[in-house]
Amino acid sequence: MNSPVYQTVIVGGGFAGLFTALHLAHEHYPRSVILIDKDERFCFKPLLYEYFDGEMDHFQVVPRFSELLKGSGVIFVQDTVESIDLHQREVKLTSGNSYNYSNLVLALGSVTGYHQVEGANVNAFPFWTQADAIALERHLRDCLQKAIKAEDSEQRRQLLTVVVVGGGASGVEMAATLADFLPHWYSALGGNSSEIRVVLLNHGKEILDADINNPLREIAERELKKRAVPIEIIVEAEATAILANSIQYKHKDKIETLATHTTVWTAGTSTHPLIKDLPIPKEHRDRHDRPLVTPTLQLLDFPEVFVGGDCAAVQDNSLPPTAQVAYQQGANIAHNLKAIALGKELKPVKVNIRGTLLKLGINHAAANLFNVFEVSGETAHLIRQGTYLTLLPTAIHDFKATTEWVDEEIFHHHLDPHDVGKKVVQAVEIVGAGVVGLLAARKLLKMLGDEDKGE
């Protein structure tokens, strides 16, 4: 008779998976932990725009899992999961290896969803990973180089036109980023920056509609017009086909064509194929095919399995697919896994939405604090960047205390609703006083990044 296997396997190294592993290590979890991800590096997706436009370096935004997990006792396996057998409690990898588990954590996130739009998966650029960011940057630089040499005005117009599909947070952040740095790049080549054209195509009547960032919509619309080149927003436009040199979309019952060599796709996500393949009945899934989980984030039919992040649907508790949600879920999953190991009672997961952060161009952002106070411009940019930097637990972040003022004072305190106004005033004062500290921290990051480039 085989001895029972007492180990926890975590599939997926996004926010939920990574922070589950790190919190297990921090809490001295008594069982072995294995983290499996197909990539060598963790991708800090909220800051991928900063990596893309050169504001931040790879060691900050896409650090290696081996560095993040060093000294934690967590075993990292870089491999692709081929299948998950919930009945046999086994995870099979494409390498031929397999792992049995006593507990499983599914944190696979979601994948880019093209919604059956013709040519989108071939001709559009997704923006989800480090590889996506590198591919898009190379393509755009190539387009600008060709535009400088192009004698035909129509060809040059196509090369200098970029269309972003999707008016949610990702689309808004992408459009704002492009509209700031593309003119800079083109001017450096000797081109006329006013020829750059950035178009944001949105299916709904308003950008950020039904999005957690909707309270920031008016600020976003205002800031999009203030970029180095104003962003054109086309609403009630449904993409119907993405071609190599154009995009077709339906607008007011007419099919329109926009000539462009670059279409960036940010128009939604789909459930991960491995999650779709799990033996979970339809009645235990939501309308997006994600598995329903209990308040403790366990599968209804397989309580030894926890699911967190974008690939989970918590019963009677709709949560936005954001980093702060996945981060908090990871901590709670770790707590409950330790409770199981020690024979203690599990606790329902509580997630506090502490605010929303939206990048609106280089050194500009908007922040909605506790849904009662809004900040925009460079102040919001510092809040956003400082908050995210404090989440990344690497050895080089020993200066964390320098930026802790943002994280602790603005986002991590539980506020009494009666004290919100007072606290917000304090928060603004703290932001002003802490700007120098954060700038010093950013300078340190830059110095460390320059050293790291030699690897």
Please state what every model-predicted region is.
Residues 48-56, 121-125, 215, 279-282, ...:
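Short glycine-enriched, charge-decorated loop/helix-capping segments at active-site entrances
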Residues 2-75, 162-163, 169-211, 435-455:
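Beta1-alpha1 glycine-rich phosphate/pyrophosphate-binding loop at the start
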Residues 30, 72, 76-84, 179-295, ...:
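A Rossmann-like FAD-binding core segment of flavoenzymes
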